[in-house]
Swiss-Prot record:
Its cofactor is Zn(2+). GO terms for molecular function: class I DNA-(apurinic or apyrimidinic site) endonuclease activity; damaged DNA binding; oxidized pyrimidine nucleobase lesion DNA N-glycosylase activity; zinc ion binding. HAMAP family: Endonuclease_8. Pfam families: Fapy_DNA_glyco (PF01149), H2TH (PF06831), zf-FPG_IleRS (PF06827). It comes from Cronobacter sakazakii (strain ATCC BAA-894) (Enterobacter sakazakii). Belongs to the FPG family. Coiled coil: none annotated. This is Endonuclease 8.
Amino acid sequence: MPEGPEIRRAADKLEAAVAGKPLTHVWFAFPELKAFEAQLTGARVERFETRGKALLTHFSCGLTLYSHNQLYGVWRVVKAGETPQTTRSLRVRLETEDAAVLLYSASEIEMLDADGVAAHAFLQRVGPDVLDMSLTVEQVKERLLSPRFHRRQFSGLLLDQAFLAGLGNYLRVEILWQAQLAPRHKAIELNNTQLDALARACLEIPRLSYQTRGTVDENKHHGALFRFEVFHRAGKKCRRCGGIIEKTTLSSRPFYWCPGCQA
């Protein structure tokens, strides 16, 4: 599943294509959304907002389209009037005079007003977004030490969107390598130096993944553009200590780490 940085990069592309322009054609596949097609035609997309792995499309009329791609959903940007040949099922089409954004294969799609956004179960449940630049290291440390999270092993905690929104498996792996921590640890066991290193990595690694631009190489995964240190590198040498990177399964996901420098 794409993680927070990839969802945010996709949102940037959608916003560049259609934001601020009147919608000339709106189409929804789901019957419960059909009534909104006429209401949204002529309105503008004001912005695309990410909340972890969820995407909120805010319209000038006050409505917001909630979507979550899960494993198979994908957005595409095409020219106005263009319909790509694909076996995917089209769910949403938002078109302006010169461009269209298409959502394929997603199953979680809802239209919300302001109260609906505030009360939405998933949006209420998710923690602060790691790509929210106002989120600080100290705030992450506070969450790590909170009674709700301080006894959770990092192998599971860093996948929990209630802790920090936008993290996922490759970020979990790279964050723990950066902080030199084994996945079995809990925040309550760490000293302040270790806590600080982990909190910094929880912000720096996702932001590096989002901000990095350039050529995608053989280390790519769901569009991540920065170099992996341990993810998908089982059997190779750790670039920090020279140890051999190992692979196992934790929280039902593949996990990579270096036993030589992740204590």
